[in-house]
Structures are given as C-alpha cells and as structure tokens.
Amino acid sequence: RKISGKECLKILCNKFGFKIVRQKGSHVLIKKETEHGKIGAVIPLHRELKIGTLKSILEQAKVSEDDFSKFV
C-alpha cells in the first residue's frame, strides 16, 4: 500500500528508535546510535512516497522491508 512521508517518519521514530535531528523544508533528517556507529536517513514529507524512495529510505536506515511492513 502507499505510505506518506509522515507515516514513514512515525514508524521509524516510534518503532525503530530513530530521533529527528533537523528539518529543512519538506525533508527531515533522522538518526540513531547503534553499537556499529550512527545510522541516518532523509525522509521527504510527501503525501505519497514512491516505491524506490521508500526502499532507499529503508536501505539508509538499515531496516528490512519485512520488519517495516509489520507496522504499515
């Protein structure tokens, strides 16, 4: 199903422990500290994220599509 940038942001922050670092315009930078270092991703707050954009965000955030889809 289609997901908005805002929904994606909520899931990554609430379920995967990311914190909002800053926002510039419609783009939000999130980060998380792990034992392997920092992980970050940029999320555009669009009404509807395209599949490639969502996959790229999940890849940057090191979150599997299966884990993410449990919360959608």
Q: Where in the sequence are the language-model features?
A:
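Basic nucleic-acid-binding interfaces
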Residues: 1-23, 29-72
